[in-house]
From Swiss-Prot:
Organism: Mus musculus
Domain Ig-like: 1-110
Protein name: Ig heavy chain V-III region HPC76
SUPFAM superfamilies, alphabetized: Immunoglobulin
Gene Ontology cellular-component annotations: extracellular region; immunoglobulin complex
InterPro entries, sorted: Ig-like_dom (IPR007110), Ig-like_dom_sf (IPR036179), Ig-like_fold (IPR013783), Ig_sub (IPR003599), Ig_V-set (IPR013106), IgHV (IPR050199)
Matches recorded under Gene3D superfamilies: Immunoglobulins (2.60.40.10)
Additional facts recorded: The sequence of the first 197 residues of the C region was also determined and differs in only 3 positions from the corresponding portion of the mouse MOPC 104e mu chain.
One of the GO BP terms on file: immunoglobulin mediated immune response
Database matches in PROSITE patterns: IG_LIKE
Gene Ontology molecular-function annotations: antigen binding
Domain of life, source organism: Eukaryota
Alphabetical UniProt keywords: Adaptive immunity, Immunity, Immunoglobulin
Length: 111
């Protein structure tokens, strides 16, 4: 993953994840985050090319947008109107057996 860092409340950040080791276009992808306060929390999901359906956690709905580029084996998370409670380590993940986890990127939202 890339794109983490320090952002002020109300700011924006875009995370990127380039996946490897599997046929990216065949799998749903997720973003999850981990924080000391909330533990591991699912953030967003994007499904396959037939519509690229998306689903979001209530806490990020209307603020975060997940997208993907199958030609680049990449999944993205555009995050707007960031809040302190969005602070955490963000991972791209692929459900399945075995599952896939990116290395994670840290986002800190603080003034």
């Amino acid at each position: 993953e890339s794109g983490g860092g320090l952002v002020q409340p109300g700011g924006s950040m875009k995370l990127s994840c380039v996946a490897s080791g599997f046929t990216f276009s065949n799998y749903w992808m997720n973003w999850v985050r981990q924080s000391p306060e909330k533990g591991l929390e699912w953030v967003a999901e994007i499904r396959l090319k037939s519509g690229y359906a998306t689903h979001y956690a209530e806490s990020v709905k209307g603020r975060f947008t997940i997208s993907r580029d199958d030609s680049k084996s990449s999944v993205y998370l555009q995050m707007n109107n960031l809040r302190a409670e969005d602070t955490g380590i963000y991972y791209c993940t692929r459900p399945g057996v075995p599952d896939y986890w990116g290395q994670g990127t840290t986002l800190t939202v603080s003034s």
